[in-house]
Amino acid sequence: MQDFLSFIVSMTKITISKQMKTMKKNYLGIGLAAMSLLAIGCTKDYSDDANGMMALYSFDEMMSTIPEAGGDKFDDFTDNPFVKTTDEPVSTFSVDADGASYAIMRRYLTYGYNINPSSVRIEEFLNYFTFNYTAPKGDDHVSIGAEVDDCPWNTGHHLLQLGIKGKELTADEMPRANFVFLVDVSGSMNSSDKLDLLKKGLTELLYQLNPDDRISLITYSGTVKKLLESTPVSEADKIKKAISKLNASGSTAGGEALKMAYEEALTNYDPKCNNRVIMGTDGDFNVGVTSTDALVEMVESYARKGIYMTCLGFGTGNLNDAMMEKVSNAGNGTYHYIDCENEMMKVFVHERSQFVSVANDAKCQVSFNPDYVSEYRLIGYENRVMSNADFENDKKDAGEIGAGQTITALYEIVLKKDYWDTFNDLTVSNKNLVTFDFRYKKSLDGPSIPLKATLTADMPFNKYGRPDDFYFAAGVAAYGMILRDSPYKGDATIEMAKSLVKQGLSFDPNGYRAELLKLMDKKNEQPQ
């Protein structure tokens, strides 16, 4: 009898395996695997049933049915090079508050995929995490600071860290919300790690809002539908009922739907509100306005009218990361990738205040003193580099910073060999190593507010100890360069990156830093 049961189970597994491998659009494998992932978080190790029960379909077999990550679309880019200060001593870039690239990396490692180097944007790895920077004071909406110390992966080089923090808002200071939920219900979203997860997130967000906040709900697949007119959160049951009815089928008329969502936001526009379109999709815009350039142009036009954008990406194998990053940047918004319930809670609950922009068109300009610095390299921010002339051009769009959000940037710098002699030379009047200028607007149509921070040329030699955040940032950057196989990674190794990250665990309010250490132990075909 036991042999007979084993035979039946074996044949059943084979039959299911054959059927599932041909169901390319059903994604049952994703559903089964994702349900396990979502129940316990993002980085748990998975194996056979812990209770010793015979699994009808093993984890490895389920993983084999998941769509290949090769279908995901990323823009290729080249790492920023070293620049000689004799050629150009000034570097300018827009802030980037996204964290999608880090969550995509976590998804790939969790599912056993190799990392696509083009998916690794080091600035988004850094800005996924909250840093323990000094809060703004008085009427300022932003604080800035800088540190410099030895570069761990290049002996003789130094690392410059720029730290930026947005003003935190109390519950009473939060502006009223005018949110339009724009939900992709096309067939490709029919998965527990896509539409089901998005529905959970939108429902969780409701619990964070105030009764007088307002929600609209628009869906798109082959057609565009307005499921819910602008409704106050005081009628939460009505909103939750509309969310519960979301089901996936059809193709994707994304461009048409996006326009309707913006028009809905404009209809209920209030200059005192947080007017925002929150779009959830796997990025498969295959019907209607599909050109990324056309979408960007449309989004920019509504951004100028005061409507912000939050882009939420879901799933693997169909993710159009390139489109979502460009659209969110153009829409005065942010781009998040939701790979699990923990990430959904991070975005919709723990960091929900970051949906409110406290600094608009935020730009950084770093001036290196050629008397002391021979070369520098901005690590990351490749698609946010700006012309130096645009720094003081208030009409030039730049990035936004959410309430309580921190932004981090790193430069690798090479000091001149006669550095100390120059510093001691009394005829050299400028003793500044670096000048960090920053500009932002409190409101989209307001004036730019300048901030400035300087580091004196003796700073690299004051070995009084650096904040733990400095070492953590260095570890994150080293890990990102390893995953990208960057030509500038120098002597960086996984063990070096882990050691640096461990030094930054004293500040870890939600456990995200500790999670990074676990991810570093996961196998990727990465150079050591």
Residue ranges of each PLM-predicted region?
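Acidic, Ser/Thr- and Gly-enriched intrinsically disordered low-complexity segments
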Residues: 110-137, 357, 367-388, 402
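Long, acidic serine/threonine- and proline-rich intrinsically disordered regions
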Residues: 56-58, 84-87, 91, 99-106, ...
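Bacterial N-terminal signal peptides that target proteins for export
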Residues: 21-30
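Post-signal peptide N-terminal segment of mature Sec-exported envelope proteins
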Residues: 50-74
